[in-house]
Amino acid sequence: SYGNMPIGSSIKPLSVYGPAFDLGNSPGSPVINAPLKIEGWTTEKGYPSNFSDGSYTGVETLRYAMVKSNNTSAAQALFSYVGIENSVNYLLKLGVSSNHIEATGAGLALGASGLSMIELAGGFAAIANKGEYLEPYAFTKVVASDGSIYLDVQQEQIRRQVFKESTAWMLVDVLKQCVGNNGTGSKAKFGGFTIAGKTGTNSDYRGVTFAGMTGYYTCAVWIGCDNYKALVSN
């Protein structure tokens, strides 16, 4: 339930690529992946670094950018295709508390924002549910001793369409590739299931995140130390 631990790249489908697809782009749309200054990026260098210098490809598709989790591409896509305000609004509609959103390039494109795992799972569940967000609950109903229903989630639960169905389909298609042999989440593929998901690693390996879905369930996990101590590796 921690909301102050950055979730890293797991945020990208919710804050960058989902909104980009929803606003008229596609997995095949081009994005610049090069060490060039990005208008709107506020660090002195002017752009975020990728995991390795050899990952700069020049121009790549949004699909490739998400599968390889390239930070420079995500930042370019955020400022070229989405915008800070739109990105924040999508996260709010996906049930993320405004207190957990860092409305900056780093917060939205790199995952410096500290979403809780129930917020992250709720966002990915909306992707799995054809773009419709259903407020997560830890129960289905509360029944009194006489059998009367005190609370029923189906009556209390907030529901809203956040992404178009076509956007959700494109996201699932790309997220399946993220868990494929060449994706950053390949180790999450198991048991012959169709799995779609996205990894996230924050600075100094202080935490590792994965949010994913099958045809039955959506889950989000954060692996790290209670004292936020750096892990040995990712």
Predicted features along the sequence, with ranges:
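A penicillin-recognizing enzyme superfamily signal
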Residues: 1-3, 7, 116-122, 126-234
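Secondary-structure capping and boundary motifs in well-ordered enzyme cores
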Residues: 3-11, 58, 62, 66, ...
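Active-site SXXK
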Residues: 6-31, 65, 123-127, 171, ...
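A generic secondary-structure signal for well-formed alpha-helical elements
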Residues: 21-27, 81-82, 91-98, 127-134, ...
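Conserved catalytic neighborhood of penicillin-recognizing serine enzymes
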Residues: 25-87, 145-177
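Surface-exposed patches in mature extracellular/periplasmic domains of secreted proteins
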Residues: 28-29, 98-108, 135-139, 182-188
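Structural recognition of the beta-strand scaffold that forms the well-ordered cores
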Residues: 29-30, 64-66, 74-78, 90, ...
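Mid-domain, small-residue-enriched loop/turn segments at the edges of structured enzyme/sensor domains
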Residues: 44-51, 81-122, 138
